[in-house]
UniProtKB/Swiss-Prot annotation:
It comes from the Bacteria. Its main location: cytoplasm. The lineage of its organism: Bacteria, Pseudomonadati, Pseudomonadota, Gammaproteobacteria, Moraxellales. Keywords: 4Fe-4S, Cytoplasm, Iron, Iron-sulfur, Metal-binding, S-adenosyl-L-methionine, Transferase. Binds 2 [4Fe-4S] clusters. One cluster is coordinated with 3 cysteines and an exchangeable S-adenosyl-L-methionine. Residues 20-31 have a biased composition (Polar residues). Belongs to the methylthiotransferase family. RimO subfamily. This is Ribosomal protein uS12 methylthiotransferase RimO.
Amino acid sequence: MPSKNPADTVSIYVPGASINSQTASDSTQPAASAYHHKANHNQNRSIEQSAQQAAEQSLHTAETVAPKVGFVSLGCPKALVDSERIITELTRDGYRVASDYNGADLVVVNTCGFIESAVQESLDAIGEALNKNGKVIVTGCLGKDAQKIRDMHPAVLAVTGAHAYDEVITAVSTHAPMPQAIQDKKAYDPKIDLIDLAGVKLTPSHYAYLKISEGCNHRCTFCIIPSLRGDLLSRPIEQVMGEAMALKKAGVKEILVISQDTSAYGVDLKYKTSFWDGMPLKSKFFDMCQALAKVGIWVRLHYVYPYPHVDKVVELMAKPGDRGGLLPYLDIPLQHASPSVLKAMKRPAHSENTLARIQKWREINPDIVIRSTFVVGFPGETEEDFEYLLEWLKQAKLDRVGCFTYSEIEGAVANDLPNPVPEAIKQERYERFMAVQQQISEQKLQEKVGKTMTVLVDEIDTEEQIAICRSYADAPEIDGHVYVDNIVQNGMMMVKVGDMLTVTIDEASEYDLFASYDAVQALA
């Protein structure tokens, strides 16, 4: 049995850093980590592996003289999906793609610009790529401020904004053109579907992100996403379902639905009706969830605002032990609870009724797990506001919570709000907030001891002989784990990555569960 406070050892691609890094549960991560992480988590397939796997399906990618593109991906899961899309197109065009600079003809850096620490990390990554390679194309959220990038790094070849896939491909083909010898061997359009509809994935083969929309219609004062990614732009429902089915066909066991505002899906399309599998289907949040629930694999919803119509979606959710369906899990970006702070943030309507809404969801589905992220130290936040938030947290008893201290973001309206909170007070409130949540989390996890749960295997630690898993209550990278022992019997490893197991919970810590697996019973 591992320690009750295990570190999650991860291997990530960090420009200029060692390949190994340590991160803890989200209570102890830096405040910004709730919104910013580097791509290439240790569970993830490397960019080389993913691109090579896809390239093996293409005749012309066997040419070793094809240009090599180094790729650095920074930011949130939505940015990771953008990276997957670009790498898919590059691979279809015959390029070799790798997650380093060695021997690359140029480097693409997909940046993050959400918070200042992310901006600085992106600028540092661009600088390192220029130093080590010299030919760099910049894309992603920070690309919106092209002048800032060019002022610091005038040698970059091209700068594009977020989800500017065609512009990136054009820039790559301009600065690293495909040799004519390879072009001459193309007897077909390189964009034809030589790669599965799901495309190249940088996540492990057993789970994948499914982005259903881009942009956001809200104008929260602390956020610059609309200026980086535009207003809400939903994918037609037939595209969403087509990718979901392709992911299932590829062996994916879990789909994580992401966007900036998942519950607003289809508003911009005016809930247009299309046809899927011979039946009419609306581009609408409820209809999409209803269809995804029938795909037959785990479906996890992220970035769901607490609108009243979410109640109907909760009614669709599966039971915790089910191995397919809409998981009883909601990731809700609440940000705060104090009415005055929510008003200053200009959060969407219905944010003030969240306690009642959460109670109703639990009445509909007692097994539902709710995760959220909060900001403390927002300009104008008083001690009274913070105490209100703490009391709200104690009543809400959320299952999974992340928190970060407010920091200014260039271009955000909140920068000009009066009464900024001193840094020392921000940090003190952060620690008090997480201390309360830690107690709530530990209490809720202790209630799981003695019960059986269905878990998905993310990793195998062969030295410790444990499987690092997740239950329906755990999203990858941001939530806890279920550590499972008894996976080796009679000298044989009984489980593998991507397996779903039924385990018995033996112990619990503040954020993780520890379980045992009975392979004999499972095979009976």
